């Protein structure tokens, strides 16, 4: 087996290994999306007051996942209603 053929096979093997390892992450992400789509997991939603700021905390109840705190800015004005008949 020539040296260039061997190095080509090594590159192809590494490329296939890279694709397989990236598909593992995609499969777990697809599982997470599918579980949210079918609502198999309940999600806790809590209003958290931290130093005068209102935040919404989301976390999985059944899965025991880590709770993620997300900031939601308060609207500065009332949004317009476009479908109101005059």
Swiss-Prot record:
Pro-peptide residues, renumbered to this chain, are: 30-70, 84-86
Which compartments is it annotated to reside in? Endoplasmic reticulum
Q: In which tissues or organs does this protein occur? A: Expressed in stems, hypocotyls, cotyledons, leaves, flowers, shoot apex, siliques, stamens and petals.
Q: Which UniProt keywords apply?
A: Differentiation, Endoplasmic reticulum, Growth factor, Hydroxylation, Secreted, Signal, Sulfation
Molecular function GO terms recorded: growth factor activity; hormone activity
Pfam families, alphabetically? GLV1-2 (PF21529)
**What is the official name of this protein in its record?**
Protein GOLVEN 1
């Amino acid at each position: 087996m020539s040296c260039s053929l061997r190095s080509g096979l090594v590159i192809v093997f590494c490329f296939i290994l890279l694709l397989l390892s990236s598909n593992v992450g995609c499969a777990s992400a697809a599982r997470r999306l599918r579980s949210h789509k079918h609502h198999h997991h309940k999600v806790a939603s809590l209003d958290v007051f931290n130093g005068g700021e209102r935040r919404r905390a989301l976390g999985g109840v059944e899965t025991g996942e880590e709770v993620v705190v997300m900031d939601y800015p308060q609207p500065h004005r009332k949004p317009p209603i476009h479908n109101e008949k005059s």
